[in-house]
């Protein structure tokens, strides 16, 4: 048995970001903590791999260059239920492979002296008098606080925080070599979003992202929808693959745990970050949000360490009162607007106004701090055309 001031379960972007952000605030505390990973890096990870500018900025602010292979996207093609719209803007997204990005973030942790212990899946979580005991095949770890960064099916969430699974979306994806398809997005540094799913009662979209796998140009093609989706989502992806001339590739389905306002994100001595807490319900994006969760959790860990209060309220309130909490609530509202009855008004507005699209993208991508601004700032930018300020 070993004792640590903090155990982080999971070494994806949320877990490593929490450790790295903690190191920026209190290096000694971060080096005394431990990050547990059930697999060994680089490990397979099912994800479209879209890293938005906010995520790249987070990495740079923490001294980590985006050195893994990636495709930079400068153009978007969006098909709405009515028409298709093109939008050009520099650095809209960086499409990475999660096995490579996650391994790079783990390397960054280790370079700072943070312990990441691989092939240690959590077998048991037991509350003790003054903390939580985490049991793995290699041993036990006692800590006053455990942070669950262990994804959509989080063991920490189910056993210590909240066993509910009502806010789970579904995604299916496939990787297809560009050669032999009819898709020109890779050559044009473009990603595509297709919202025609709404015509069939599905609340979500289809996507095609340019990516590189072992140096070979590929398309990551997928479908995302809030529940219920089921067979219609599979059928929609099949039709999209045929439309792009992508054949019948192997597909992988995966759950996405999305953020629901008011959901429990913490319990006594157990907090959640990243997918375990909840990602963007509108698009299912989680990488950059995972990093931002890490900043807030790290600051709360330092505060808890000083006060001795590891209760749920400290972290829950810190998150809800932060700009990230506000962004997640707005994304939840946007889900209702774009995937509900009001979609017939929202999509036409975006189709007609490039200025509105630019503001929306900059807000979503976190460019120039847009995601931390008030709604009045957006209105002023739309009226004055001062979007880049």
Residue ranges and their predicted role:
Residues 15-16:
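N-terminal Rossmann-fold NAD(P) dinucleotide-binding loop
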Residues 124, 225-300:
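FAD/FMN-dependent oxidoreductases across multiple families
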Residues 39-62:
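Conserved N-terminal glycine-rich FAD pyrophosphate-binding loop of Rossmann-like flavoproteins
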Residues 302-389:
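C-terminal helical "tail/cap" subdomain of flavin- and related membrane-associated enzymes
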Residues 7-11, 20-46:
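Glycine-rich FAD pyrophosphate-binding loop
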Residues 9, 148-149, 272:
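Redox-cofactor binding/interface segments in oxidoreductases and associated redox assembly factors
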Residues 56-106:
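A conserved beta-strand/loop capping segment in the N-terminal third of enzymes
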Residues 21, 108-246:
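Predominantly flavin-linked oxidoreductase catalytic cores and closely associated redox partners
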